[in-house]
């Protein structure tokens, strides 16, 4: 596939508070994320290295607000802003946030599998 849109995305993952629609482009995942309710990923990242996301992400926020915490600071990303999240971040978003994100496919798949397992252990899996 050489292109992907929210509507054409072949993969849909429902996390409860959020829905990801995505596809792959030459080793990178392209994910369109819709946040349905305020969601802080702190609990679902506990147990991963550093209790944070080990996968880098590049992206663009189209609506809402995304707050990204690091060990020594936090950043707020708002509509119209592009971002880079290096490994070691903990994101939180308000309801109504929409973004598109690009991540190395293999790293993202490993992180998502670990996150889903942690959510199931915590009784939050869908």
Spans of model-derived segments:
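Short acidic-glycine-tyrosine-enriched beta hairpin
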Residues: 70-89
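A short, N-terminal "cap"/entry segment at the start of jelly-roll beta-barrel domains
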Residues: 1-42, 49, 116, 121-126
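Short strand-coil-strand connectors
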Residues: 26, 69-73, 94-96
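Residue-level detector of beta-strand face positions
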Residues: 22, 65-67, 92
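Ligand-binding loop in jelly-roll beta-barrel domains
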Residues: 87-112
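A short, polar/proline- and glycine-enriched secondary-structure boundary/capping micro-motif
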Residues: 42-44, 78-80, 110-113
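Short, surface-exposed beta-edge/turn micro-motifs
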Residues: 28, 55-56, 88, 97
